[in-house]
């Protein structure tokens, strides 16, 4: 018998961070019932007696606080699990919200999560051609090799730091602090700034890129260019025009797909990285690491850890 809601969640196979988050959501619901049950005057205030009416009142309360439907749906799912635990404990006879669902909630687009090993393999198997390559004597080979070296450095930051493609393009020389083992990621309209730790395995490769590869790439760019990742000229041109960086993602995506059929795109990589973070760190830490402006954005990734998040509900309350 699971004597506490926490042990009940653990028995369901939830990760440590999910258990902590879900337990706090349940406590928030209980606190609401204790403090604000006057909105339901016929309610005694005891959570064992809570019905769909009280749950709907709580969801209205969250809506007034500005929570999005997706976030409130996660909260609703937690209350469902809490009621199921109460049934197991003999504290209630049935689950009054078993088929309750918030209308208008769009299904979170879930990417198949790549394991840590699969993410590492994407990086490790991305090959940089050597001077013994059969095309090494072609006039385009030098820039081709440089682009591969640049791309491998980019993959390192996407797989370990979970950067978005626009964030990669915005990184400047001053943002990469190799001596301190840190990377500064500037904020934007959609994301917060943050400083992330570099892993020890990244330092030497990033140093090689910054002080060797980038210096060679600079020959094809403006000498005062401050971006960390530089473009190579398109075929037939002697210099980069400054827009080529915006065109690397489709080609790089196709390259990786050829070797890794499970790979879909770089949003999948970021989703996988954040999902793995949530198994290791708490919500607020992951919110900072991911650059999310609101914790509700981070909460959405909890869906990737919850296999039973209302996939099979056929009936719903017209909320």
Show which residues each predicted segment covers.
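Conserved catalytic core of the tyrosine transesterase superfamily
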Residues: 1-319
């Amino acid at each position: 018998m699971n004597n506490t809601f926490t042990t009940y969640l653990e028995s369901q196979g939830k990760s440590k961070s999910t258990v902590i988050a879900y337990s706090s959501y349940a406590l928030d619901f209980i606190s609401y019932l204790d403090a604000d049950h006057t909105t339901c005057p016929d309610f005694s205030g005891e959570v064992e007696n809570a019905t769909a009416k009280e749950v709907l009142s709580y969801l209205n309360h969250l809506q007034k606080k500005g929570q999005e439907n997706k976030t409130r749906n996660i909260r609703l799912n937690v209350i469902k699990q809490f009621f199921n635990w109460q049934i197991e404990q003999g504290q209630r006879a049935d689950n009054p919200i078993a088929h309750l669902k918030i209308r208008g909630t769009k299904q979170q687009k879930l990417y198949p999560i790549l394991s840590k090993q699969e993410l590492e393999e994407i990086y490790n198997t991305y090959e940089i051609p050597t001077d013994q390559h059969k095309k090494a004597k072609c006039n385009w080979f030098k820039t081709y090799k440089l682009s591969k070296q640049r791309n491998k450095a980019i993959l390192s930051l996407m797989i370990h730091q979970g950067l978005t493609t626009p964030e990669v393009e915005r990184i400047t020389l001053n943002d990469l602090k190799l001596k301190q083992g840190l990377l500064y990621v500037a904020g934007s309209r959609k994301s917060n700034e943050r400083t992330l730790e570099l892993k020890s395995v990244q330092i030497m490769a990033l140093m090689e890129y910054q002080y060797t590869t980038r210096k060679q790439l600079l020959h094809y760019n403006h000498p005062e260019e401050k971006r960390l990742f530089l473009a190579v000229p398109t075929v037939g041109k002697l210099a980069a025009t400054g827009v080529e960086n915006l065109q690397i993602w489709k080609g790089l995506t196709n390259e990786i797909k050829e070797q890794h059929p499970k790979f879909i795109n770089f949003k999948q990589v970021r989703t996988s990285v954040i999902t793995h973070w949530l198994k290791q760190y708490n919500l607020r830490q992951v919110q900072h690491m991911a650059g999310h402006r609101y914790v509700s954005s981070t909460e959405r990734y909890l869906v990737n850890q919850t296999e039973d998040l209302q996939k099979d509900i056929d009936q719903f309350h017209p909320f």
